[in-house]
């Protein structure tokens, strides 16, 4: 969800977006043209709202006649970077669930053209051919160009060997477009494995991540989301999707 700062792909996140210059506009979709007999997920227009002391990006998701609200939130300082103009984050976050349950996806807001092309032409065909559990679904959406952004570069910091490797490789290199500006701690499903201890475990990991951020002189962005509870999945198999949310 954090493609809005706009984090270079070291972090993945699609919820964070471009900088300023955003046309606040609703995008209409002609649902009458869609096959009515197919099971589908409808991603309504995302919106930004204040929730307690956080900035929250929310989209109502219609599934088989019921509606679930999916949200992603950050500190208000980063609220302007949340991306309401595209359905990108929600498409990626729900793609695995949709393929496993045989639901096509319909988006009210546009999807970035390059992303929709890669998912439709390469990712879905490859996944559906490699696993009988994943259906070759359709995504119906208008396309739009990539949004301008603040050119930030971030990566997740779990304090595991992989995240430290990325940190070491990109904290100071010769490529400005890939030089880290932020570290990120997301909550998109991994902490459910700790059940009743999940809150305590997450708070301890945030403190540890903050120590690392302070030590290397980078800002830490802490996000939260209900994606895992709104659409329960096995995080071990789906983290590649949810981590890009």
Stretch-by-stretch model annotation:
Residues 9-10:
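Intrinsic disorder
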Residues 155-161:
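Short, glycine-rich nucleotide/cofactor-binding loops
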Residues 37-152, 166-226:
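RNA-binding accessory domains that recognize and position tRNA/RNA substrates
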Residues 219-245:
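Conserved adenosine/adenylate-binding substructure
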Residues 21-22:
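Glycine-biased, low-complexity coil/linker segments
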Residues 26-39:
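Short, Lys/Arg-enriched N-terminal segments with co-localized hydrophobic residues
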């Amino acid at each position: 969800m954090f493609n809005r700062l706009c984090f270079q792909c070291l972090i993945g996140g699609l919820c964070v977006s471009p900088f300023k210059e955003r046309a606040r506009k609703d995008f209409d979709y002609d649902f009458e043209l869609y096959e009515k007999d197919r099971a589908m997920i409808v991603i309504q227009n995302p919106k930004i709202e204040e929730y307690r002391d956080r900035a929250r990006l929310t989209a109502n998701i219609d599934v088989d006649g019921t509606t679930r609200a999916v949200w992603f939130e950050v500190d208000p300082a980063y609220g302007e970077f949340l991306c309401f103009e595209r359905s990108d984050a929600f498409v990626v976050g729900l793609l695995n669930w949709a393929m496993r349950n045989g639901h096509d996806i319909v988006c009210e807001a546009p999807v970035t053209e390059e992303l929709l092309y890669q998912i439709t032409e390469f990712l879905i065909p490859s996944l559906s051919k490699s696993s009988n559990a994943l259906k070759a679904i359709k995504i119906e959406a208008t396309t739009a160009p990539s949004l301008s952004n603040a050119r930030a570069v971030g990566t997740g910091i779990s304090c595991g060997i992989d995240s430290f490797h990325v940190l070491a490789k990109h904290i100071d290199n010769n490529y400005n477009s890939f030089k880290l500006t932020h570290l990120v701690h997301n909550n998109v499903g991994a902490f459910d494995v700790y059940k009743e201890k999940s809150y305590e475990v997450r708070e301890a990991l945030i403190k540890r991540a903050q120590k690392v951020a302070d030590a290397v002189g980078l800002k830490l962005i802490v996000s939260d989301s209900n994606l895992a509870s709104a659409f329960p999945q096995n995080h071990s198999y789906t983290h590649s999707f949810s981590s890009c949310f």
